[in-house]
């Protein structure tokens, strides 16, 4: 039904109907708003009420000339009341037409008033909108999405009447008379009245409880959390548990980060981690802590995480949880001169001294003893070992890398983009990278920053030492050095925590805090170190400076400076360790000896024969050497003993007094050397005598004895023969037996015919040595010459004839050579078997009393002994008597007892015997040359022939040459192979 045409209506005639409709709509709207928080739901129960409320919100009064207050667009509702609404509108139209003319004048007058009121209302609405809060968004019924409940709005502005504004501002429910045509309002009103009565009948406490349950949890309180009682923050049995899980030391933070990443990855999956938190404490190494409801949740979170050991997890008790999570932040104020340590990097753990602080307090300029490898350019980078800490050396730095070296001042250098001043590395480091607590520097470390012990500030050192308060005992002599009573001294009477009760020298009892006291000592007191590096060391006080006490150590025999709080009075000066004393020579293992240079409470610091320094326990020492009469020779061959003052030849040139001598090593001591308390080791041949103990000036007689200095006498080396193929001496271990390098060991690397290239064990130096000057070491340790070494390598037995010289050339060192007048065992020798008799032996050939041998020519026709069956004549002669007509001569050639039988095999002699004596071409007996005898000639050959008969005298020289050097023992003459020729004997040469 279309009602868009504007109509002019009479206000008085239509006031009743319009006011009733407006009041009903306003009543429904107000009641629905004030009924309850869910009042909007009540209006949605009926579609018709929704239509009226919606049209009322979207419509406003318009100009009386253009639009009537009852001119409203209503869509078809769900209740089917369209016909009733049409009838009401038709009646209104008829009445309007009848009264149009009567109300024209009044409408014109009212039009101006309404415009003025409209302007005022617009101003008030603007003020309300600007001053009011944010408008609440209207709630819409989900069922209205299928209905057209919007009213058509005219182009002109609409405004509410004054009466409507007053109705909207009323607090109570205005009950107006409603016509019979307004259906459904009573039912809704009754429903609202019933709900109000129910709310009023409810008990106030019960209502408050309902509101508390409904809105209590969503309320938030804004306030200061510091006012919350601490007991409310303590964990209880309702809180999750904390599990301590063991892990690999140093991996605690990595494991916590791994768990965090795992939780983030599984957060939006079907199986997220069910743990609440995971954390670690730097002070509790080797553990991480996981907060969870169940232990299985912890195991699931740690599944697959490396370096975690979940076998024995520990449930942290509830009462220990606050201590575990408590963080006590201590702010340490750094001052210039304080000592700190580097946290990480190449200088991790090194001591540094604060030089200055930045303005923002985040960085500090520190001095560090540098660690520089000046040969780093020649080595591969990222070496596993870090260089030794020592002061900067500008000369070595310049030689190492001149391009990165520059001088900026007298003691200021720039090297490798790092600044060095007075030998120290000066560097700006963040304070977070420094360890400022528990530094505990030692005096040795501090002395590096004060090399001359000048201006040694132990007060700043005390600030860096953890637990800087002394431990006082009743009876200690103390002195007050802080506060109003500075300088007062006395004796401790009682100790109550940090409060010390002392009795002053005036007899007054004073209560002084322990931090203001220090122990007091006098010169000459025996003290004992009760804390620190030199704990349990004893000594006598020699110097006192404020809180610093210097005493002479009984074990180290040096002056040590410590804090007075670390000292206590000692009854005697006995050292704690008595098993071994300072400077004892001890045996560590089979090949290592060492000298003790420092004695601590449970350990010893020793230096071995190779210069290595180590710290050992008493159980690691095998024995103690007590050889006080050791003797050795120095570089010049002079005798050195314990107590002599010697000096190193080469190297650093250090000098000192000999403490011990062990084999080829000496242990020396020099009080002027601070390193290792002045103890060092060297080889005896690398030192030279400066002053001998007792002013010994006698020569070393051992060097004059060749048997002691050169070893056993060796025969001269024969001519070295050229070897074929690879020399067997290559790779052999040799010892030089003469020359400037005598006694050194080495290995042959290459050889020539006469020389060998030897790599010495000392210094790996390569030298060229003649082969005849070398002694070769066998597997048994025997030293042999080069010739014998080669022969043994070829399988030739020593003493046999060398095949290289042939069978005719004797070997001088062999006993079977022919002849040698100076050697009694050479040929001839009377008792050497079948050799020619010696020239001076009494048993000439044949001897006159040699049994049944061939009778001598002047033996008086003696017959061989009756029982000489095996003697000459021949072995098968049957003891025949010589021929009847031969006189004194040897029996006939064809007798059964020929001497020797021609076919007697190896009998003496036989012309065809391969081993004739002498052999025809081997080692012949020297012959007479030019009528004179020589001892070096060859043995006469067998090939001489007799020019006379057998019974005549033969004067041929080859057959009458006597044995060399023996004029009374002629050699038997040769015999011819012709018939009738037989051996014969001739008298000695005239």
Curated annotation (Swiss-Prot):
Residues 29-41, 52-74, 824-862 have a biased composition (Polar residues). CDD domains: KOW_Spt5_1, KOW_Spt5_2, KOW_Spt5_3, KOW_Spt5_4, KOW_Spt5_5, NGN_Euk. Residues 818-916 are annotated as: 11 X 9 AA tandem repeats of T-P-A-W-N-X-G-[NS]-[KR]. One of its GO terms (biological process) is transcription elongation by RNA polymerase II. Residues 133-142 have a biased composition (Basic residues). It is found in: Nucleus. The modification Phosphoserine is found at residue 36. Sequence repeats lie at residues 818-826, 827-835, 836-844, 845-853, 854-862, 863-871, 872-880, 881-889, 890-898, 899-907, 908-916. The keyword Cytoplasm does not apply. Its main location: nucleus. Residues 960-974 have a biased composition (Low complexity). Signal peptide: none annotated. Keywords: mRNA processing, Nucleus, Phosphoprotein, Repeat, Transcription. Residues 471-498, 520-547, 727-754 form the KOW domain. InterPro entries: KOW, KOW_Spt5_1, KOW_Spt5_2, KOW_Spt5_3, KOW_Spt5_4, KOW_Spt5_5, NGN-domain, NGN-like_dom. Component of the spt4-spt5 complex. Interacts with RNA polymerase II. Belongs to the SPT5 family. PANTHER family: SUPPRESSOR OF TY 5 (PTHR11125), TRANSCRIPTION ELONGATION FACTOR SPT5 (PTHR11125:SF7). The spt4-spt5 complex mediates both activation and inhibition of transcription elongation, and plays a role in pre-mRNA processing. This complex seems to be important for the stability of the RNA polymerase II elongation machinery on the chromatin template but not for the inherent ability of this machinery to translocate down the gene. This is Transcription elongation factor spt5. It comes from Schizosaccharomyces pombe (strain 972 / ATCC 24843). The gene is spt5.
